[in-house]
């Protein structure tokens, strides 16, 4: 179509018309749109809205959509935000929530960004996997990982969010940040079983260490070291050593700490653990020597036997 010709005719008509209705101004804005003269769209749309108000008429939804587009092209996100609020107030639709969220993203307003997602979720407007995953990530950014974990868990159980390594990894991270290691473990197990590298196995080992499940900790740490491709294998060795120490497997624990000590940043901690192990082994050796020489004394016997004897 000949949009420049249309624009020229409109301008001539405006020059002759003393009291135009809103619609011709909207037509003018649409012509500017077709000509990709987006900044020039704003004035006629706002004029149309002003005339509508003066005549006690409501501005139409598509007028606001057109104005929103013009401001978006001009990267005026503050105006985009304001228009989306009007659209939501009068025509609450899913796409307007996400447009509002996009404006908050561009403005760096994380608090209101999450509020927009929350409102969309409360109204049942979140449907797709990426929408729920994005919302969970926003919760974690705002340091409310428990809500992120609950959201992901629910949507994975419903089948909306896929049960893959990436999503299980995110779920486990949310539970761990919420200091819910017992709930992080099932997600970590699922993620680790799907992972090629050993990072998630080591993370799983740390969760087992935190809740005192030392046999499982050893198994997971060894799996991680076996798979390899670890960013910090020394940390994996330290975790393994701590779990072995708690199982009183001092020789194996010492080997793990010796392996970790080969890395400069872990050397001091590892050597401290080695000293603790050596001291514990020596203490046990002295006890055994004393028992062989003198027989058991009350101080060498377990507390429950001493109590029984008394």
Where are these regions (language model features)?
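Alpha-solenoid helical repeat scaffolds
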Residues: 1-246, 252-286, 292-310
């Amino acid at each position: 179509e000949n949009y420049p010709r249309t624009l020229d005719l409109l301008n001539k008509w405006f020059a002759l018309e003393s009291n135009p209705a809103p619609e011709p101004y909207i037509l003018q804005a649409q012509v500017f749109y077709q000509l990709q003269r987006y900044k020039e769209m704003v004035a006629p749309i706002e004029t149309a809205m002003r005339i509508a108000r003066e005549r006690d008429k409501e501005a139409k939804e598509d007028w606001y959509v057109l104005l929103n587009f013009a401001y978006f092209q001009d990267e005026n996100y503050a105006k985009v935000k304001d228009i989306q609020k009007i659209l939501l107030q009068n025509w609450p639709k899913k796409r307007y929530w996400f447009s509002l969220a996009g404006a908050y993203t561009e403005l760096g307003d994380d608090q209101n960004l999450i509020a927009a997602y929350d409102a969309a979720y409360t109204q049942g407007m979140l449907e797709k996997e990426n929408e729920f995953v994005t919302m969970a990530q926003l919760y974690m950014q705002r340091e409310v990982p428990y809500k992120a974990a609950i959201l992901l868990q629910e949507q994975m159980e419903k089948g909306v969010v896929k049960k893959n390594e990436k999503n299980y990894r995110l779920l486990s991270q949310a539970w761990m940040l919420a200091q819910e290691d017992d709930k992080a473990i099932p997600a970590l197990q699922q993620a680790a079983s799907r992972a090629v590298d050993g990072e998630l196995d080591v993370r799983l080992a740390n969760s087992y260490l935190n809740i005192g499940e030392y046999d499982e900790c050893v198994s997971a740490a060894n799996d991680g070291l076996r798979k390899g491709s670890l960013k910090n294998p020394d940390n994996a060795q330290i975790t393994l050593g701590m779990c072995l120490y708690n199982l009183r497997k001092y020789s194996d624990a010492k080997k793990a700490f010796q392996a970790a000590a080969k890395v400069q940043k872990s050397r001091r901690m590892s050597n401290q653990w080695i000293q603790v192990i050596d001291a514990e082994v020596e203490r046990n050796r002295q006890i055994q020597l004393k028992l062989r020489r003198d027989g058991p004394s009350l101080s060498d016997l377990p507390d429950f036997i001493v109590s029984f004897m008394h």
